[in-house]
Amino acid sequence: MASVFPRLRKGAILTFDPATGVPIGTIMLQYNPETLTRSLQPQAVSEEPDRTEIFRLKGPPIETIKAEVEIDATDQLGAHVPDPVAVRLGIGPQLSQLELLVYPSSTVLLANEALSLAGTIEILPMESALTVFAWGAQRITPVRITELSITEEAFDPRLNPIRAKVSLGMRVLNVDDVGFITPAGSLYMAYQLAKEAMAAQAPGRGA
């Protein structure tokens, strides 16, 4: 599955079919964020472990990632031959791509409504795509979008946004969330193994 990831120097958000791992789409970050905030919450056995459990962990930490992303159509609009999509829609398509990460598909919504009207008693919650955050070759991990805040800062004469800042909040999905024998579980284990390999290169390791 790792072979589907582009060899690029920009961060990206990718989507896959959660069951098969088949790629669905790629959202390249136009500009890499200047900062990336990560938080890790250790999973202790209990809130107040006794002496026999003080060094035990239930599983991987709960890791969250926050990033501020800028999207700007200035270059496309100012080119010798302006981008026709940017001229017509500004950065609306890019914003819509990001927003749809937290939407169920309209096809599934309509299908569930049809089931409801047909009297189906139990309708399963709607499944979203597997979302993957790629930040360099060593940090490719499955995530769930927990926060998406958009500030539109400039508009064209048609009121299409042409510049915006997007605040992204993500929670890393680990094997406790998705299991081992799934595309997401395989990606998470590769992510942790890459972290362990990187830690082994630190000065003083094993000294």
Describe each region flagged by the PLM.
Residues M1-A207:
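Acidic, Ser/Thr- and Gly-enriched intrinsically disordered low-complexity segments
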